[in-house]
Amino acid sequence: MNQIKMNKSFAEFSKLPKIKQVFTPWFIAALVIFIVGLTIAFTMVGLLNEGFENARALVNDQGQIIGKVADVSGDNHSLMSWLGYDQHANYQELYKTIHDQLINGKTMESLINNTNKNNDPKLYEALHYHAHSKFINHNGTWGFVTKVLSDWENSWFYKYNQLFSQLANSQNPVLAAQGIKSLAKLSTIIQYQNPNYIAYNWVFIVFMMPQMITFIIIVVKLATVFSPKKSAEEKQAYKLAKLEVKNQKKAKKLNNSLQQINLNLEAN
C-alpha cells in the first residue's frame, strides 16, 4: 500500500479545491476557538446586561428603580446619576485625601466647616466633589457595574460615600441631609449589587482577547487562498521588471556621478 503523502508542496496545495485549501487543520482549530470563545464572551455580556440595565434605569427620589431607561439629558435620574457616580473621578484618591485627615482625630463635619479652598484645594475638592461632579451619561455603565455593583465592599466609590454618611447625626440640617443621602446611596448600592458581575467580566476578557489572534489567522488564511494567484510567467515577468527598474536606478546614479566628476574637472 502506498504511503499517504501528508505534506504537499505549494504547487500541489494550490491545485486543490479552494474549500480544501481553506479548511486545513490549523484553520479549523482557529475557527472552533473563535466561535466557542465568541459565544462564551457574548454570553457573559448577556449575563452582565442585568447590571447595565439597572445602571441606566429610571429611579425615583429614593433611588428605587421605576422604569427602563432614564433620560439623563433631561430631569430624570438613572441609578448611576442618582448615586452621583462619575466615571472620570479617582475615588481612591478622593477617599484617601479625606481619610488621612480623619485618622488624625478630625471629623467630617469639622473638615467641611474649616477647610478653605485656597489653603487646601486638594482636600476642599475631595470634600465637595459630590456637589459639582458631572452627572454622568450612560457611557460609564460598564465601569459602574464592574467596579461598584460587583464588589461594593471594596469599591472606592462606596468607601467615599461611607465617609459622608458620618454626617447623618450632625446638628447642622444641611450636613445631616447630606449624610442621610449618603446612607441611602450605600443601601441602594447593596440592594442592586451582584458579586457575579466581576466573574462575568473576567470570563468575558479571558475569552474575548484570543479572538483577536484567531480572527487574524482566519482573515489571513482566507485572503491567501482567495487572492488572485500569479502564473509562473507572470512572476518571472514581475521579477524582470523589478530588476530592470533597479538597473535603471543604478545607471542613473552612475551617470550623475560621472557628470559631477566632469563638472569638477572642468572647474579645475
UniProtKB/Swiss-Prot annotation:
UniProt KW Transmembrane helix keyword: yes
Subcellular location, record wording: Cell membrane
Superkingdom: Bacteria
Transmembrane segments: 27-47, 202-222
UniProt keyword list: Cell membrane, Membrane, Transmembrane, Transmembrane helix
GO annotation, cellular component aspect: plasma membrane
Membrane topology: Multi-pass membrane protein
UniProt protein name: Uncharacterized protein UU131
Annotated organism of origin: Ureaplasma parvum serovar 3 (strain ATCC 700970)
